C-alpha cells in the first residue's frame, strides 16, 4: 500500500488539514511541541482501528477525539491510497470472486430470475462458471479498483461510517462499511445519502446482469436463437452460456467497470460466507483463509465481511512504532506458534524475537533476509556490533514451587572485541536499532510510521539512520524533533511538512515553490549547518544581521517587558544570525514557505537605498530592492518605497512586514546605539564594533540594556510570543 494524500476535519487539533503529494518513499513531519504532528499518526491509527472494530462487529466511540472547534460535531478522516503489492491486489480480487461464486447462493439466486426457477446449477456447471468468473476477477481487469480513498466519518448520533471510494468510467463508486443499514460492503454511487437502506446480494445482481439485462438479446449467440424458441428457451440458453458451455467456447469477457456500476446502481453487497469443502481448496479461498483465519467450510467459523477484509489489508500494510522503545527485561519463552506462523507478517515489536528465529531457520529467501537485518543493524549501530539468536533450555521454579524446564529465546549482541551481552541487558538505543532494522527491511509494500525514531539514538546513529531510511523499500512517514534526521538535499526537502499550531487549529506547510526556486542555496544552507534545519522545530525565529546581535540580544531579551524573565529557549524561539544584510531575503522566504513565525532586526541601512561605509562615503545599497520585494510578499498591504522616501517612512513600512530597526531619525547600526558606542570607546583599547559573539555577550552583560535595544526587542518578541500569547492570524487551508 502507498499513501498519497491525507485529509482530516475536526480531529483533535487537525481541524481542517490536507497533506497532498506525499512521497512514495520518505516523508518527514516536523514542528514544535503541541503542533499536531502525532495527531496525524493518531488519525491514521484510529482509521485502522475503526476497520478492525467494524470487522469484529463492535462499535467504538470517538467522542473524545473531536476538535474543540468542531461544528458540526463530525470527524472526517480521508486517506487516498493505492494497493500496489501483489498480495493486496490478489486479496481484493479473491474477495470479489469468492463473494460472487458461492455455489449454494448462486442456486438460490438463479431460481429468483424469471423462467429459471427450475434451473439447477450442478457442481459441474458451477465449476465451469467459476472458471470463467475467475478470469474476470484478475488484477489486470480490476486496475481501476486499486486506487481509491479510505474514508471515516464519525458522528455521536450515528456512530462510525467507513467507505472505500474509487472511480468507474469516470463516476465515483463507494463501498460502504461499518454501518447498518446498509449491509456492510454495499456498493453505492456518490453522493452517499445519510442513511441508505436498500441493499441486495451481489450474486443476484450478477446473474441479472448476465441473464436478464436489457441488451441481453443483442448478446445472444445465433445458435441459441430460433424462431420457435420461447422466451424461457432463450433465457435458459443464456444461462447455459455461462454454466454449460462446451470446451473451448467460454463466454466473452465481463466489463467489470460496467458491472460494478450496476452493483452501485442496485446497491449490491459483498460478503464471503460458508462454502462447500471442495471450494475451500481453490486458490482464492486459500489466500483469504491465510489472511483471516476463517475456515469457510465450517458453519460456525464466521463470515468475511468487507470491513474485515480492509482491516486485514490495513493491518498488514501499516506498521506503527512506539515513540519509546523498551527492550525485553529477560529472554522470552519459546512459542512455536509465534516462531512459525502461517502468516509471517510482522506488526508488533513484541513479536520480533519469534519472527527473527522463524526467518533465521526458514527457507533460503528468509535466511537472506535475516542476514540483511544483521547487516542493517551493524550499519545503524556502528562499532562493528552485530546480533544473533540463542535458543536454550533453562530450569526455573513454577508457581507451584516445583522446578521445570523452559525453552527461551535470547537476542545476543556481540561487539568488536568479541564480548557478548543479552539484548535484555542493553540500553534502549540498541533495541530501537534492531526494531528499526527489522521493520525497515520488511517494509516493501508497507507504510512504516516512525514516531520520534531519534529519541534513543545519539547523533551519529541518527545520521546512519538517514542512510537506512533512504534505502528502505517501503513508504516511510517520520515524525521527528531531530534536525539530524532531516535530508539536506533540496529535492528531498519537498517532502518535509511543518505543522504550525494556530488559534483555531493546526496548519500544515511544505516548502513548495520556494525550494524549487532556491534549490542550490537551500541545499548549501542545510548541508553547511544543522542550525538551519533546527529552525523548523521552533515556535518562531528572530533573524539578526550578524554575530554582534546574536551575542547581545539573548542576554537582554529576558529583561524586556515582553520577555518577562523568559529566555529564548523558554519560549522556543530561535535567534539566527543570517550572516549579513544581503541574506535577509533568503531567510525570510524560507521561514514564510514553512509557516514559521518570524521577526527580523537589521541595521537601519538594510532598509535604506544608501548607506555610509567605514570610510564615511555614501554607497548604494544593492540589496534594497531585493529586501523590499520580499517584505512586500510578506505584507502585500505595504507599497514598494521610492528611494526618496524618508527613513521614518521606510522604518514604519518595514515594521508592518516584521522587519524592525532602531528607532532613530537616521539609520544606525548596533554599534551606533549611544550606550554601546560609549562602552566600546571606553575599553582599554577603544573599538568601533564588537567583532565576535564573545565580545557582544560581554558587552551586553556589562551595561544596562539601552532604550533603543529595549524598544526593538519588545517589538520583535511581542510579535513572536508563541501561541496562545500571540494572536492567531486567520487560518487558511494548507499545504
Regions found by a protein language model. Name each.
Residues 1-59, 370-376, 397-535, 550-552, ...:
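Switch/communication elements of ASCE P-loop NTPase nucleotide-binding domains
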Residues 6, 75-79, 153-167, 178, ...:
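Short polybasic amphipathic segments
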Residues 11-13, 24, 35, 84, ...:
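Short, solvent-exposed loop/turn segments at secondary-structure junctions
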Residues 23, 90, 131-134, 156-161, ...:
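Acidic, Mg2+-coordinating catalytic modules of nucleic-acid enzymes
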Residues 29, 286, 324-326, 477, ...:
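Hydrophobic/aromatic beta-strand patches that form the interior of the parallel beta-sheet core
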Residues 42-149, 153-160, 221-239, 245-251:
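Conserved P-loop NTP-binding catalytic core
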Residues 73-75, 320-322, 445, 474, ...:
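Short glycine-/polar-rich loops that comprise or flank the Walker A/P-loop
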Residues 212-214, 219-223, 227-238, 244-264, ...:
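Extended helical coiled-coil dimerization/tether regions that scaffold
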Amino acid at each position: 500500500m502507498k499513501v498519497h494524500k491525507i485529509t482530516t476535519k475536526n480531529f483533535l487539533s487537525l481541524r481542517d488539514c490536507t497533506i497532498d503529494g506525499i512521497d512514495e518513499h520518505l516523508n518527514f513531519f516536523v514542528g514544535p511541541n503541541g503542533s499536531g504532528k502525532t495527531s496525524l499518526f493518531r488519525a491514521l491509527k484510529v482509521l485502522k482501528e475503526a476497520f478492525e472494530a467494524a470487522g469484529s462487529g463492535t462499535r467504538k466511540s470517538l467522542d473524545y477525539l473531536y476538535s474543540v472547534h468542531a461544528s458540526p460535531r463530525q470527524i472526517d478522516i480521508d486517506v487516498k491510497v493505492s494497493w500496489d503489492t501483489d498480495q493486496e491486489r490478489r486479496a481484493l480480487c479473491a474477495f470479489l470472486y469468492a463473494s460472487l461464486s458461492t455455489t449454494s447462493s448462486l442456486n438460490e439466486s438463479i431460481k429468483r430470475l424469471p423462467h429459471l426457477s427450475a434451473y439447477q446449477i450442478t457442481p459441474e456447471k458451477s465449476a465451469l462458471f467459476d472458471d470463467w468468473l475467475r478470469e474476470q476477477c484478475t488484477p489486470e481487469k480490476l486496475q481501476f479498483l486499486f486506487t481509491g480513498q479510505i474514508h471515516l466519518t464519525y458522528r455521536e448520533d450515528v456512530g462510525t461510517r467507513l467507505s472505500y471510494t474509487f472511480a468507474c468510467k469516470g463516476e465515483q463508486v463507494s463501498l460502504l462499511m461499518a454501518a447498518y443499514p446498509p449491509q456492510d460492503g454495499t456498493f453505492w454511487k456518490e453522493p452517499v445519502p445519510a442513511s441508505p437502506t436498500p441493499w441486495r446480494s451481489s450474486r443476484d445482481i450478477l446473474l441479472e446482469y448476465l441473464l436478464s439485462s436489457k441488451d441481453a438479446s443483442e448478446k445472444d449467440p445465433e445458435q441459441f436463437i430460433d424462431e420457435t424458441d420461447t422466451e424461457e428457451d432463450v433465457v435458459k440458453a443464456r444461462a447455459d452460456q455461462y454454466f454449460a458451455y462446451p470446451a473451448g467456447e467460454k463466454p466473452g469477457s465481463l466489463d467489470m467497470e460496467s458491472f460494478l456500476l450496476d452493483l452501485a446502481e442496485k446497491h449490491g453487497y459483498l460478503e464471503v460466507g460458508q462454502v462447500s469443502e471442495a471450494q475451500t481448496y481453490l486458490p482464492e479461498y486459500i489466500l483469504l483463509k491465510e489472511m483471516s483465519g476463517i475456515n469457510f467450510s465450517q458453519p460456525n467459523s464466521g463470515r468475511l465481511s468487507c470491513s474485515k477484509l480492509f482491516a486485514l489489508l490495513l493491518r498488514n500494510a501499516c506498521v506503527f512504532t512506539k515513540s519509546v522503545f523498551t527492550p525485553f527485561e529477560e529472554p522470552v519463552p519459546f512459542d512455536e506458534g509465534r516462531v512459525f506462523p502461517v502468516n509471517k507478517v510482522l506488526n508488533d515489536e513484541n513479536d520480533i524475537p519469534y519472527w527473527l528465529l522463524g526467518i533465521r531457520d526458514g527457507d533460503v529467501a528468509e535466511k537472506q533476509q535475516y542476514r540483511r537485518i544483521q547487516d542493517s543493524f551493524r550499519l545503524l549501530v556502528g562499532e562493528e556490533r552485530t546480533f544473533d539468536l540463542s535458543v536454550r533450555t533453562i530450569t526455573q521454579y513454577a508457581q507451584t514451587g516445583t522446578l521445570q524446564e523452559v525453552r527461551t529465546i535470547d537476542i545476543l549482541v556481540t561487539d568488536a572485541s568479541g564480548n557478548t551481552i543479552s539484548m535484555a541487558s542493553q540500553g534502549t538505543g540498541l533495541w530501537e536499532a534492531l526494531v528499526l532494522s527489522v521493520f525497515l527491511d520488511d517494509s516493501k509494500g508497507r507504510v512504516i510510521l516512525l514516531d520520534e525514531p531519534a529519541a534513543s539514538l545519539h547523533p551519529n546513529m541518527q545520521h546512519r539512520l538517514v542512510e537506512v531510511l533512504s534505502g528502505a523499500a517501503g513508504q516511510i512517514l517520520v515524525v521527528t524533533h531531530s534536525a539530524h534526521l532531516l535530508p539536506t538535499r533540496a529535492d528531498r526537502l519537498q517532502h518535509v511538512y511543518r505543522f504550525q499550531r494556530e488559534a483555531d487549529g493546526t496548519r500544515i506547510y511544505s516548502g513548495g515553490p520556494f525550494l524549487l526556486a532556491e534549490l542550490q542555496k537551500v541545499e548549501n544552507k542545510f548541508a553547511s549547518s544543522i542550525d538551519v534545519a533546527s529552525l523548523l522545530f521552533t515556535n518562531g525565529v528572530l533573524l539578526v544581521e550578524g554575530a554582534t546581535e546574536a551575542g547581545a540580544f539573548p542576554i537582554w531579551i529576558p529583561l524586556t517587558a515582553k520577555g518577562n524573565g523568559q529566555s529564548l529557549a523558554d519560549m522556543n524561539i530561535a535567534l539566527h544570525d543570517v550572516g549579513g544584510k544581503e541574506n535577509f531575503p533568503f531567510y525570510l522566504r524560507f521561514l514564510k514557505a514553512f509557516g514559521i513565525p518570524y521577526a527580523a532586526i537589521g541595521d537601519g541601512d538594510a532598509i535604506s537605498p544608501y548607506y555610509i561605509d567605514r570610510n564615511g562615503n555614501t554607497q548604494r545599497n544593492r540589496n534594497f530592492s531585493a529586501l523590499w520585494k520580499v517584505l512586500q510578499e510578506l505584507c502585500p498591504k505595504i507599497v514598494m518605497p521610492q528611494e526618496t522616501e524618508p527613513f521614518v517612512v521606510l522604518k514604519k513600512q518595514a515594521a508592518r512586514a516584521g522587519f524592525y530597526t532602531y528607532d532613530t531619525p537616521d539609520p544606525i547600526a548596533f554599534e551606533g546605539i549611544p550606550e554601546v558606542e560609549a562602552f566600546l570607546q571606553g575599553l582599554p583599547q577603544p573599538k568601533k564594533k564588537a567583532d565576535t559573539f564573545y565580545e557582544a555577550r560581554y558587552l551586553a552583560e556589562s551595561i544596562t540594556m539601552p532604550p533603543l535595544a529595549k524598544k526593538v526587542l519588545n517589538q520583535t518578541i511581542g510579535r513572536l510570543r508563541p501561541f496562545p500569547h500571540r494572536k492567531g492570524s486567520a487560518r487558511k487551508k494548507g499545504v
